Each structure stands twice: as structure tokens, then as C-alpha cells.
């Protein structure tokens, strides 16, 4: 029994010593004869890639047309493209010329370089105003119309003799003359200000000489009183 009980303890002791012992030194030549040496190459493959396939739809050959028809169609397309480019260039030049004919404020400049006048242009120019957009430099130099132009436009739109609808209605409804409506607080303030001005009117009428004379008299009386008090104290 004692020997059987001692055997597990000996096994545990030997296992503990086995774990505690250092491993054997690494030998790179020990496993060379056990199997073939494998080399993994991650570079580009040396085999050529598979041939390119265009697919089932593109693999069908397209029958070529005759050389004469192809050249004629190409010439027609190039001629139409040249005509379209010429028309675009012509329209662009016309728009530039129209933009140069107008002043900085979008008004038609006079030939004598006078201040800008109101826009008086032929119908064809006014029709193309939206198409002739200004450039960046012209937009940056854009200025509002002058004060004289604004006053002239307002005077032409509404004459000075004509009255507004509200003014006409007010003149028609007004019968006899009525005094203007005054707020009670404003009336009280005005009366108090008038009363205060009337109370202080004599002093303002006397001027600065009366006030100075009064102060001088008070000063002399005060000096006399002080002298009398000092004399009596001694």
C-alpha cells in the first residue's frame, strides 16, 4: 500500500521536473532528411495569362461596309460638325458685340460717352438681352443707376400733380376743418414746459449781470457776519 501510494507522488515529481527542465537546443539540420524541402514563391507567375475572350455578343464579326459609303458618311459628318461650330462661333461673336454696346449698369451707352441713359434699344436687341449675359469682369464692374436716373423714372411713372388713392379718398371724405388730434400726455408736457418757461422768463430777461450782482451782495453780507462773530468771540 505504501509503495502504491508513493508511485503517484513519484510520477507527479517527475512530471514537474520534466516541465521545469529547459528544452533541447534547436537544430536546423535535424529535420532536413525527414521530408522534401518546400519553397513558396510569391512573385509574379511565369506562366502566360489565358487568351482574352470578347464574349458571345462581341465575338460575332461585323460585316464591313464599302469604303466609298464610309468615306462619304465621314465627310458628311465632318462637314456638319464644322457648320455647327461656325454657327456657334458666329452667335458667340454677336453676343459679345451686344454686351460691348451696353454700359456697366446694363444701360445703353451713348456714342459721345455721356452718362448712361435709359435703355432705348431696337426690338431685336431687347429680344437677345437674356442671351447676352455679362462676363465676370463686367459683372464685377456693375454699378446701380444714378440718382438722377431714379428720380427721372419715378417722375415719369407718377406725376407730381396726381394724388395717391389714399390721399384722394382723404380729400373727398374731409368736410369741415377739424383740429389735429393731440395726445393728453403730449398736451400736458407742452403746457408744463410753457408754464416753466414763463416762470423763468424774468431771470432770463435780467441777463447774467443781475445774477452776478446778487451773488456779490450775498458774499459781502456773509463776510460782514463772519467778522462780527470773530470780534464778539474775542
From Swiss-Prot:
Mutagenesis / variant outcome for changing residue 147 to A: Complete loss of interaction with host ITCH
Coarse class of the protein's main subcellular location: host cell
Motif placement: PPXY motif: 23-26, 49-52, 144-147
The protein's role, per its UniProt record: Plays a role in the transport and release of virions form the host cytoplasm to the extracellular space. Relocalizes host NEDD4, a cytosolic E3 ligase, to cytoplasmic vesicles.
Region of interest (Disordered), ranges: 1-104, 158-182
Record remark on domains: Late-budding domains (L domains) are short sequence motifs essential for viral particle budding. They recruit proteins of the host ESCRT machinery (Endosomal Sorting Complex Required for Transport) or ESCRT-associated proteins. UL56 contains three L domains: the PPXY motifs which are involved in the interaction with ITCH, a member of the NEDD4 family.
Signal peptide: none
Homology family: Belongs to the herpesviridae UL56 family.
Membrane as UniProt keyword: yes
Gene that this polypeptide is encoded by: UL56
A Pfam family the protein falls into: Herpes_UL56
Protein name: Protein UL56
Keyword entries, A-Z: Host Golgi apparatus, Host membrane, Membrane, Transmembrane, Transmembrane helix
Subunit and partners: Interacts with host ITCH; this interaction induces ubiquitination and probably degradation of ITCH. Interacts with host NEDD4; this interaction increases NEDD4 ubiquitination. Interacts with UL11.
Domain of life: Viruses
Stretches that traverse the bilayer: 211-231
Biased amino acid composition, Basic residues: 85-99
Location of this chain's protein in the cell: Host Golgi apparatus membrane
GO cellular component term, pick one: host cell Golgi membrane
Membrane topology: Single-pass membrane protein
Amino acid at each position: 500500500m505504501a509503495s502504491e501510494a508513493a508511485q503517484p507522488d513519484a510520477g507527479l515529481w517527475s512530471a514537474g521536473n520534466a516541465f521545469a527542465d529547459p528544452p533541447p537546443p534547436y537544430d536546423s539540420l535535424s529535420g532536413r532528411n525527414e521530408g522534401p524541402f518546400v519553397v513558396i514563391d510569391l512573385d509574379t507567375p511565369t506562366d502566360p495569362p489565358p487568351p482574352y475572350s470578347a464574349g458571345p455578343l462581341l465575338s460575332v464579326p461585323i460585316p464591313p461596309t464599302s469604303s466609298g459609303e464610309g468615306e462619304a458618311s465621314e465627310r458628311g459628318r465632318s462637314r456638319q460638325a464644322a457648320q455647327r461650330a461656325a454657327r456657334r462661333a458666329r452667335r458667340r461673336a454677336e453676343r459679345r458685340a451686344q454686351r460691348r454696346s451696353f454700359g456697366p449698369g446694363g444701360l445703353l451707352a451713348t456714342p459721345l460717352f455721356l452718362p448712361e441713359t435709359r435703355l432705348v434699344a431696337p426690338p431685336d436687341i431687347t429680344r437677345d438681352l437674356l442671351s447676352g449675359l455679362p462676363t465676370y469682369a463686367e459683372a464685377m464692374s456693375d454699378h446701380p443707376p444714378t440718382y438722377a436716373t431714379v428720380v427721372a423714372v419715378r417722375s415719369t411713372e407718377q406725376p407730381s400733380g396726381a394724388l395717391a388713392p389714399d390721399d384722394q379718398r382723404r380729400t373727398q371724405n374731409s368736410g369741415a376743418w377739424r383740429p389735429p388730434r393731440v395726445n393728453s400726455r403730449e398736451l400736458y408736457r407742452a403746457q408744463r414746459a410753457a408754464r416753466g418757461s414763463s416762470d423763468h422768463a424774468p431771470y432770463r430777461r435780467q441777463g447774467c449781470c443781475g445774477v452776478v450782482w446778487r451773488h456779490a451782495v450775498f458774499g459781502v453780507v456773509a463776510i460782514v457776519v463772519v467778522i462780527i462773530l470773530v470780534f464778539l468771540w474775542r
